């Protein structure tokens, strides 16, 4: 399979290992619905890469998932802890927190680590990697009801200050951030448009059709 040599290189270097998004996000996770999908810890790959090249730490996604169909870049963000431990949650505080997340930069730097490793180690052809199907999934630990809301602006006006409402706001704003990642920036990389899922729905993204 196309990307196997790349993953094997990182594993053989001892830079990373197989894990789950729950272990990456919160090693002491007490959720009942823990993810069972095996992923590669990409933050660990980034650390190995920066030590090898003696560079300032790049951004990176949290994990990779690879099968014969596609390579998935995965970024995990936890809103629940922010909501639970922030005094007097406001929309302004949520917006300030969002600025730290840099979803596009994490994807861009991760792709660069992959491409640079392929070039330096001559593992597979760069063209093969670029043509192989890819996608970017942002995973968060809040979710909203399945009923669609009319629009972000309208839905935010409807919010009260209950925890469910703040969950909804975090979901809607994260969805907006993910939707704004420009697809045209990844032309030639066979990258699907990024999408957002809740952690409870993550495993379903990899179930057989």
Task: Identify the function of each model-found stretch.
Residues 63-65, 70-78, 110:
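Conserved catalytic cores of phosphodiester-cleaving nucleases, focusing on short active-site segments
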Residues 28, 44-46, 67, 78-80, ...:
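Short, flexible loop/turn elements at secondary-structure junctions
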Residues 128-197:
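Short, low-complexity, polybasic intrinsically disordered segments
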Residues 56-60, 69, 131:
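Short connector loops at helix/strand junctions that flank enzyme active sites
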Residues 51-54, 61-62, 122-127:
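Catalytic micro-motifs at enzyme active sites that drive phosphoryl/nucleotidyl and oxygen chemistry
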Residues 79-144, 169:
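Catalytic cores of nucleic-acid endonucleases
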Residues 1-58, 199-209:
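Basic, amphipathic N-terminal segments that precede the first structured/catalytic domain
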Residues 60, 73, 83-85:
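Acidic (Asp/Glu-rich) sequence patches and key acidic residues
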């Amino acid at each position: 399979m196309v990307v196997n040599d790349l993953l094997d290189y990182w594993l053989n270097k001892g830079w990373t290992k197989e894990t789950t998004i729950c272990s990456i996000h919160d090693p002491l996770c007490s959720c009942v619905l823990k993810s069972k999908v095996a992923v590669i810890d990409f933050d660990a790959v980034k650390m190995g890469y920066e030590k090898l090249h003696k560079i300032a730490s790049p951004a990176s996604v949290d994990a990779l998932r690879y099968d014969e169909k596609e390579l998935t870049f995965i970024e995990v963000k936890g809103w629940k802890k922010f909501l639970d431990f922030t005094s007097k949650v406001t929309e302004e505080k949520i917006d300030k927190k969002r600025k730290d997340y840099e979803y596009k930069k994490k994807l861009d730097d991760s792709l660069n680590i992959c491409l640079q490793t392929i070039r330096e180690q001559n593992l597979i052809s760069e063209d093969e990697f670029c043509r192989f199907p890819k996608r970017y999934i942002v995973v968060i630990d809040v979710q909203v009801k399945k009923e669609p809301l009319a629009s972000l602006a309208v839905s935010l006006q409807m919010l009260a200050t209950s925890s469910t409402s703040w969950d909804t706001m975090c979901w809607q704003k994260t969805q907006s951030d993910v939707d704004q990642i420009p697809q045209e920036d990844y032309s030639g990389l066979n990258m699907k448009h990024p999408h957002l899922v809740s952690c409870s729905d993550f495993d379903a993204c990899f179930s057989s059709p």
